Amino acid sequence: MYSKTIPAMLAIITVAYLCALPHAHARSTQGYGRMDRILAALKTSPMEPSAALAVENGTTHPLEKRQIYDTSCKGVYDRALFNDLEHVCDDCYNLYRTSYVASACRSNCYSNLVFRQCMDDLLMMDEFDQYARKVQMVGRKK
């Protein structure tokens, strides 16, 4: 009895795996392509400081990658808020392994398109409203 059901179950599992695999691959490559386009647009933007480009070329040390408190953030200083926002940028850096992603994610006190794209690529969009409130709190002018 079991000798007939085991091969059938293995066949079903194999078919399900093969059907899901192309979709998983397309999601990750699609996210990587979007991030490349965002970063390329930021690099060519005249408003972007040249220091970020120097970091990408390796001429300076990217201290902002490890910086927990951004002096441009004029709102509430709460370590828990910064820690939550910092984890998104750190995870995004670990996903793409590009120092420019880390610095662009933190720019303008986390209120930027790269931060949102990082949340999307990390599959965290169901928590976006919660993180948007945190960004508003740390970036609010006094």
From Swiss-Prot:
Chain segments annotated as coiled-coil in the UniProt record: none
PTM annotation (Valine amide): residues: V138
Tissue/organ expression: Produced by the medulla terminalis X-organ in the eyestalks and transported to the sinus gland where they are stored and released.
Gene Ontology annotations for the cellular component aspect, listed alphabetically: extracellular region
Post-translational changes noted in the entry: The N-terminus is blocked only in isoform CHH-II but not in isoform CHH-I.
Predominant subcellular localization, coarse grouping: secreted
InterPro entries: Crust_neurhormone_CS, Crust_neurhormone_H, Crust_neurohorm, Crust_neurohorm_sf, Hyperglycemic, Hyperglycemic1
GO MF: neuropeptide hormone activity
Keywords: Amidation, Carbohydrate metabolism, Cleavage on pair of basic residues, Disulfide bond, Glucose metabolism, Hormone, Neuropeptide, Pyrrolidone carboxylic acid, Secreted, Signal
Gene Ontology biological process: circadian rhythm; glucose metabolic process; neuropeptide signaling pathway
Matches recorded under PANTHER family: ION TRANSPORT PEPTIDE, ISOFORM C
Stated name of the protein: Crustacean hyperglycemic hormones
